């Protein structure tokens, strides 16, 4: 599948929710139902076993071999790949952080790759994301 980086605030086809917001919500719902793999090792295993339904890769990964590996596995098995600009942002979205009293993320750990194996319940965010992936 073709991969491309999502620009901040890029409008979704339906116009109700942008793709980044939809992706954030879908990742949170997948985490709730234990359908989220985080980190290169877990993601590579899920991609190789073909249990992955969607792969999210940070664009600023410090090791180019990681990027090539994930892109190759996604292309080989026909899994959709979405790139986000920052690994810290992806780390916050997949729960690799502490939340303080005000609800702000603290001590965010960067995440190079995340894979969704189970989406969880059907939602508007999932529909927006699927429409976006179909149009690419």
From Swiss-Prot:
It comes from the Eukaryota. InterPro entries: Ribosomal_eL30-like_sf, Ribosomal_eL8/eL30/eS12/Gad45, Ribosomal_eS12, Ribosomal_eS12_CS. Coiled coil: none annotated. GO terms for molecular function: structural constituent of ribosome. The keyword Ribonucleoprotein applies. It holds the Pfam family Ribosomal_L7Ae. PROSITE patterns: RIBOSOMAL_S12E (PS01189). Keywords: Ribonucleoprotein, Ribosomal protein. GO terms for biological process: translation. One of its GO terms (cellular component) is ribonucleoprotein complex. Belongs to the eukaryotic ribosomal protein eS12 family. This is Small ribosomal subunit protein eS12. It comes from Cyanophora paradoxa. The gene is RPS12.
